[in-house]
Amino acid sequence: ITVFVVAILLWLNVLTLAGPSFSLCPAGQPTTTVTTTGGNAAATVAATGGAPVVGDMPAQTAPPTTANLNAWLNNFYNAEAKRKSTFPSSLPADAQPFELLVINICSLSWSDIEAAGLMSHPLWSHFDIEFKNFNSATSYSGPAAIRLLRASCGQTSHTNLYQPANNDCYLFDNLSKLGFTQHLMMGHNGQFGGFLKEVRENGGMQTELMDQTNLPVILLGFDGSPVYDDTAVLNRWLDVTEKDKNSRSATFYNTLPLHDGNHYPGVSKTADYKARAQKFFDELDAFFTELEKSGRKVMV
């Protein structure tokens, strides 16, 4: 689910640590960074400009009993509850506008990519940052999207994903306060499992779903719902945002052409995963190539 979104989360939430070629922070504003470090000893939280303090995370050295695992997990949640990315209150007058496109892909892991023979696909040449050694710790599309949309705060339990969070936890709200226009796109109708409802109620995305009228349907989900062509959806995004008077935009795009059970119209058998993955990677590669040629300042 998160191969294509983990890098963006890190980038957005450590802007004050290194920063992109264009800064989101007002010129001259001091930065504060918080880094969690691990090892055999207890985790240490180091804050710039201050003395290191001992964190709440214990070493993972105790026997893996139920009690120890539960205790470690609870300590993890307690430590995560203190984590938050602080955004600037405003942008400087000379801040360079850019667009942000977050692509949230269902049913795609490094193991899937390897099995589909796509580890050397040209798509990877477009990436500046890749993370290959991680556990997304997500159970399904809904929780994964909520965690992504609440990326400005630390991780919570699955149960608490469906409880209100502090206002400053919602990533796209934080960007909206800095003048970024929100856009919401989906490669499906968002109805199964109440996905669209979860994105709105638990992820804080209240903007209207981008128009899906006349988008070509390339697949049907296991519930018979339409799965739209990604190239067509992304091209519509290009058209909509290009007409937008605001040159700063932040878009969340959830797509599921690789979801288990997807099949071609008129065919009941599940479509071959490898063929779907190849097509999807080819489409993203072509889209990124055209985006680079356009000269638009877009971070994907």
For the regions a protein language model found, what residue spans apply to each?
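Extended hydrophobic/Leu-rich segments
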Residues: 44-45, 73, 291
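Metal-dependent active-site segment of extracytoplasmic phospho-/sulfohydrolases and closely related
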Residues: 101, 279-300
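Active-site-proximal alpha/beta segments of enzymes that process anionic O-linked groups
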Residues: 21-34, 52-268, 275-279
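Transmembrane and membrane-interface helices of multi-pass
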Residues: 1-53
